[in-house]
């Protein structure tokens, strides 16, 4: 199947039909004789697919062009912003230089004033400078002491938190045991008690004797013992919770006190720095008196700090004592739980429940251990992060120093080569703009070419529509001609049948007439032929001659002959095939 004729038509842009209208196929353009409707449809589909592909390519090209244009615009905006930043930095640097020059001039003037003064005020100044140095040494000592105390307090806080976690685990175990006991009132309830009530409960717990074992038959006694043990365990749990709350409150208080101490230390440092600066600038006795007052206030504040630190130590010792009491309570509770387990080890169902409880406790212990390991890992990670932060801070400080040095060098270079840099930047920007304009021009040319190809394709689509209309017309003509040919063929067959009938009738008539003429001849020539055998022989001979003559007459008129070219064919089927080929 060749696509050359349609491609030629699409390239020229002319319509494929020179003589449109309803007519025979011989009047159509000769290039369409070799095509079938299926081939034309395939070519139409291919052209539509190519058109769609071209449209998609145009869209992609437009999107790429837009993206490049946006990138160029963003690049130009970034360059503008960088220029503005450089200009702002240069202005700030100039302002800093001016401020530094003013400060240098002021310091020079102050140095000149100090030189003009006598040696006595200089000695007074040196004597006055000794005082802030002593203050600074005292502040540094206090700082070291406070830092050591802070570290010690942090360690104690960590211990308290670990003990708190252990106590919470014990409380959860006790809750599980109480829930497994089956009593309706053994759910975990927080009981807020005052300090006097807690002390009374502790005394009662110490004075109360341990319950003795009873017989396993008496169920009522067992239930009473279980209830009393549950109540006792609830009291112990509430006391443990109170201890934990008190420990948390003390830890919070200690943290607040540490923060206040740090703030006071920072205030002292600021005051010491302020005093040292005032002493360097001025050398008068009034300032010395103020500094004496400040020293007294600093000493009083140091004393208050030491008192607070001692109070904090006392509170920590109290927390430790309470924690030791809680540990003793924990041991007692464990012993009582073991006793209860021994009592309740009679029935197999209770044994199964105990085994399940043991299994759940082991699971919880494993979970607690895993959580502790995770906490340790997190602590190690935090320590590593802290070390990394320290290293990063050191590197940051180094980078800041290098940055300051670089800024100074940049200021010097900008003063020397500002004009050169501006010229080079302008040249580079102009070159980049020229390249961008060239790229835009080339893209515009490509866009124009694509538009031309689109116009050609639209024209080709119009020609394809005309071709489709012509194909429909030709198909209708072909179907009409086929119907007419079928009708003509039917009429020919009917005529052939009529001819055959007429020929038979004619033969019959001729045979009858020949017989009559023979009879007349026989009657006329009866004298000549007397023998009957001779007459029969002549009669038979004449009949044979007539039959031969009548047999030759229908052979002279052929029935199966083409109406267009006159070719004689043996059968009707071959005649139909020949007629279709001859007409087409």
From Swiss-Prot:
Changing residue 50 to K: Disrupts direct interaction with Rab8; accumulation in the retinal outer plexiform layer; loss of retinal ganglion cells and connecting synapses, degeneration of entire retina without elevation of intraocular pressure. Residues 58-219 are annotated as: Interaction with Rab8. One of its GO terms (biological process) is negative regulation of canonical NF-kappaB signal transduction. CDD domains: UBAN. A motif (LIR) lies at residues 186-191. A zinc finger (CCHC NOA-type) spans 554-584. Residues 267-295 have a biased composition (Basic and acidic residues). Phosphorylated by TBK1, leading to restrict bacterial proliferation in case of infection. GO terms for cellular component: autophagosome; cytosol; Golgi apparatus; perinuclear region of cytoplasm; recycling endosome; trans-Golgi network. Residues 1-32, 267-302 are annotated as: Disordered. Keywords: Autophagy, Coiled coil, Cytoplasm, Cytoplasmic vesicle, Endosome, Golgi apparatus, Immunity, Innate immunity, Metal-binding, Phosphoprotein, Zinc, Zinc-finger. Self-associates. Interacts with HD, GTF3A, TRAF3, TBK1 and MYO6. Interacts (via UBAN) with ubiquitinated TFRC. Interacts with active GTP-bound Rab8 (RAB8A and/or RAB8B). Interacts with TBC1D17. Binds to linear ubiquitin chains. Interacts with LC3 family members MAP1LC3A, MAP1LC3B, GABARAP, GABARAPL1 and GABARAPL2; OPTN phosphorylation increases the association (at least with MAP1LC3B). Interacts with RAB12; the interaction may be indirect. Interacts with TBK1; this interaction leads to the Golgi localization of TBK1 and its subsequent activation. Plays an important role in the maintenance of the Golgi complex, in membrane trafficking, in exocytosis, through its interaction with myosin VI and Rab8. Links myosin VI to the Golgi complex and plays an important role in Golgi ribbon formation. Plays a role in the activation of innate immune response during viral infection. Mechanistically, recruits TBK1 at the Golgi apparatus, promoting its trans-phosphorylation after RLR or TLR3 stimulation. In turn, activated TBK1 phosphorylates its downstream partner IRF3 to produce IFN-beta. Plays a neuroprotective role in the eye and optic nerve. Ubiquitin-binding motif (UBAN) is essential for its inhibitory function, subcellular localization and interaction with TBK1. The LIR (LC3-interacting region) motif mediates the interaction with ATG8 family proteins. This is Optineurin. The gene is Optn.
């Amino acid at each position: 199947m060749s696509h050359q004729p349609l491609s030629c038509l699409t390239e020229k842009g002319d319509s494929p039909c020179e003589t449109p209208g309803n007519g025979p196929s011989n009047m159509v353009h000769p290039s369409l004789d070799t095509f079938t409707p299926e081939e034309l449809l395939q070519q139409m589909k291919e052209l539509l697919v190519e058109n769609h592909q071209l449209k998609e390519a145009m869209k992609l090209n437009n999107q790429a062009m837009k993206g490049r244009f946006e990138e160029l615009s963003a690049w130009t905006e970034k360059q503008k912003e960088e220029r503005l930043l450089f200009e702002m930095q240069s202005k700030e640097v100039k302002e800093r230089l001016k401020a530094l020059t003013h400060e240098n001039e002021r310091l020079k003037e102050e140095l000149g004033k100090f030189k003009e003064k006598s040696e006595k005020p200089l000695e007074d100044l040196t004597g006055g400078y000794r005082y802030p140095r002593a203050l600074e040494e005292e502040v540094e000592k206090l700082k070291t002491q406070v830092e050591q105390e802070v570290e010690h307090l942090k360690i104690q806080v960590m211990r308290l938190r670990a003990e708190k976690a252990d106590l919470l685990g014990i409380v959860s175990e006790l809750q599980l045991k109480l829930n497994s006991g089956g009593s309706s009132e053994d759910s975990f309830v927080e009981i807020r008690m005052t300090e006097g009530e807690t002390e009374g409960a502790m005394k009662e717990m110490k004075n109360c004797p341990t319950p003795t074992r009873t017989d396993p038959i008496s169920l009522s006694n067992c239930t009473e013992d279980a209830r009393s043990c549950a109540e006792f365990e609830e009291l112990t749990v509430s006391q443990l919770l109170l201890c934990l709350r008190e420990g948390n409150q003390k830890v919070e208080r200690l943290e607040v006190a540490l923060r206040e101490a740090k703030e006071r230390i920072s205030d002292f440092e600021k005051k010491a720095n302020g005093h040292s600066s005032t002493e360097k600038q001025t050398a008068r006795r009034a300032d010395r008196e103020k500094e004496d007052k400040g020293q007294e206030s600093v000493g009083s504040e140091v004393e208050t700090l030491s008192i607070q630190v001692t109070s904090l130590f006392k509170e920590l010792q109290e927390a430790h004592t309470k924690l030791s009491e809680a540990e003793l309570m924990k041991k007692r509770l464990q012993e009582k739980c073991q006793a209860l387990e021994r009592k309740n080890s009679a029935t197999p169902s209770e044994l199964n429940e105990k085994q399940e409880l043991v299994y759940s406790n082991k699971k919880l212990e494993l979970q607690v251990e895993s959580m502790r390991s995770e906490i340790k890992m997190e602590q190690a990670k935090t320590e590593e992060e802290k070390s990394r932060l320290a290293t990063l801070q050191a590197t940051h400080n180094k980078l800041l120093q290098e940055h300051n040095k670089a800024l100074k060098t940049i200021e010097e270079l900008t003063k020397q080569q500002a004009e050169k840099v501006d010229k080079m930047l302008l040249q580079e920007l102009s070159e980049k703009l020229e390249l961008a304009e060239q790229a835009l021009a080339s893209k515009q040319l490509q866009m124009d070419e694509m538009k031309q190809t689109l116009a050609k394709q639209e024209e080709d689509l119009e020609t394809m529509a005309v071709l489709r209309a012509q194909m429909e017309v030709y198909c209708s003509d072909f179907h009409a001609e086929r119907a007419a040919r079928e009708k003509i063929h039917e009429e020919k067959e009917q005529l052939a049948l009529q001819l055959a009938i007429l020929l038979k009738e004619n033969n019959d008539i001729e045979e009858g007439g020949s017989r009559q003429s023979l009879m007349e001849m026989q009657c006329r020539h009866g004298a000549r032929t007397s023998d009957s055998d001779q007459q029969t022989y002549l009669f038979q001979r004449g009949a044979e001659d007539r039959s031969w003559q009548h047999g030759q007459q229908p052979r002279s008129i052929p029935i199966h002959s083409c109406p267009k070219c006159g070719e004689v064919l043996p059968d009707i089927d071959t005649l139909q095939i020949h007629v279709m080929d001859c007409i087409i």
